[in-house]
Structure formats: C-alpha cells, structure tokens
Curated annotation (Swiss-Prot):
CDD domains: IMPase (cd01639)
UniProt family annotation: Belongs to the inositol monophosphatase superfamily.
Protein name (record): Nus factor SuhB
Source species, domain of life: Bacteria
Entry GO MF terms: inositol monophosphate 1-phosphatase activity; metal ion binding; RNA binding
Organism per entry: Xylella fastidiosa (strain 9a5c)
Length: 275
C-alpha cells in the first residue's frame, strides 16, 4: 500500500503527463527559451510544473518546492524536488523519450520518488525502506559482477562541454569492457532503467539535483548503490548541497568498477563541483 504522499505525487505526475501529451502534436506553437547553448525550456515545461505544484501544494501547503523552472521556494527541510519534463530537447524534437520526476526530500535525503513516462504509461515509484516498483511490480537492479558485457547509460551535460574530451576518454576506456553505452537525453529515465535492470549502470557529471533526486532513491530501493565520482556519498538534496553534481549508480560491484575507470581515465579529476 502506497503512502499518502506517494499517491499525491502519482496524481501530480499523471496530470503533468496529460499536459505533455496534449501538446505533443503542436510543438511548433510552443515558445522555447534557450537557457544555454544546449539547454532549453518551453511553455510546456512551465505548464507541467504549475500543474504539479498545484496538486502538491493543495495536499501539503507547508512543504517547500525545488523545481527546475521555479527554483527553491519555502521550507527546504521538507520539500518537493521536481523536474516537470526531464528530456526537454527530446520532447521538442518529437523524440519519444522523456518523463516527469518528483521526489520528496527530508533533511537533504529523498524519502519518496515518482518517475512517470507518459508515452509508455510506465510509473516508477519508491519509498525509503519499502522497495522500488514499476507499474505495481517490484523491481531490482541487474546482478552483474563487473563491467564485462554491461549496458551503461550516460549524459553529456550542457554545463560540462569544456570537459567533453575527458568524458570521451572515459567512454573509450569503458568500451573496452562494456557491451555498449547509451546516451538517452533523460537522466531520470536513465536511473529508472538502472533500477529495473534495463541498464546496468549510469554516470554523468554536471547534472542538476532535480534531474536525479527521484532516480537516486529508485536505484537504492531496487538494491543498487549511488555515489559520486570519488566514491563518496551522493550529494545532499537541499540548500546545503550543490546545485549540480556528479553521479554513479548501479549495483554496488558495477558502480565501484565504473567509478574506478572514471578516476583512472582522468574524468573524475576534470569535474569541478563548484562550477
């Protein structure tokens, strides 16, 4: 039985999903803002976030909000961390891979998570200590023992393009062991896919906390492990934590092996968490 907070999160995510689907055939009418060279937002991002915030605030008016479009509002000790459209570039091009991500964070740690893919009607949920679920089915991370034959997910952050050479060097080293590496354009779905075993691990630098807050909990509750590029604990999700971070996720053996390649290739040294 889901917690009341998760039920509200699911309702909010599904409402936002309806907003995304209603506009998918009229993308040319959307107003698009270029936040940086490779980072975009649109009317539909804002509309979806407003729908989510309205649902959450109605049920829990005392909780704070950290959203991609609206920033931090209110109480940061207990807050919702929202990405109303993770994979905006995909969405705006009609590429069918994007989602809504919502996490409830208490004292810097995610306690509940929802990731919803409206196109596939796939609903990922997790609560701390209660496991991870995909459409009412318990999920687990893959059980590989090392990097050999793994399917890895990554992203090329628009905020870290100057370090692309280091990431490509890391990718080159990983391809000597992994079966393949995917770059899907949605960090939240990348983590959800690690949680359900569709991918073996995920790594990325310069990723925003709202992109990964829900996915981190999903991976942990699916029996996985999450750390930064140095092998330390993943960052806090509050005003004391960084706005962007570096992340490695998978089962503990694969995550550690991946983190070691990141360090040995020099990619970890290239990342500056203060950027």
């Amino acid at each position: 039985m889901q917690k009341p907070a998760v039920n509200i999160m699911v309702k909010a995510a599904r409402s936002a999903g309806n907003v995304l689907l209603r506009h998918i055939n009229k993308l040319e009418t959307l107003h698009v803002i270029q936040k940086s060279r490779m980072d975009y937002a649109s009317d539909v991002d804002e509309m979806a976030e407003k729908v989510i915030v309205k649902e959450l605030k109605r049920a829990y008016p005392e909780y704070g909000i950290l959203g991609e479009e609206g920033g931090l509002q209110g109480n940061h000790r207990i807050m919702w961390v929202i990405d109303p459209l993770d994979g905006t570039s995909n969405y705006l091009r009609g590429f069918p891979h994007y989602c809504i991500s919502i996490a409830l964070v208490e004292n810097g740690e995610p306690t509940d998570a929802v990731i919803f893919d409206p196109l596939r009607n796939e609903l990922f949920t997790a609560s701390r200590g209660a496991g991870a679920i995909l459409n009412e089915r318990k999920i687990r991370v893959a059980n590989r023992k090392d990097l050999n034959g793994t399917m890895l997910n990554t992203g090329f952050s628009p905020r870290e393009r100057s370090r692309a050479h280091a990431q490509l060097k890391c990718v080159d080293a990983l391809l000597m062991q992994a079966e393949d590496i995917r770059r899907s354009g949605s960090a939240a779905l990348d983590l959800a896919y690690v949680a359900c075993g569709r991918a073996d691990a995920y790594f990325e630098a310069g990723i925003k906390v709202w992109d990964v807050a829900a996915g981190m909990l999903l991976v942990r509750e699916a029996g996985g492990y999450v750390c930064d590029f140095k092998g330390a604990d993943a960052p806090r999700m509050d005003d004391k934590g960084p706005e962007s971070c570096q992340l490695v996720a998978g089962n503990i053996k694969v995550a550690h092996a991946l983190q070691q390649v990141i360090v040995s290739s020099g990619y970890g040294r290239e990342f500056d968490p203060k950027r």
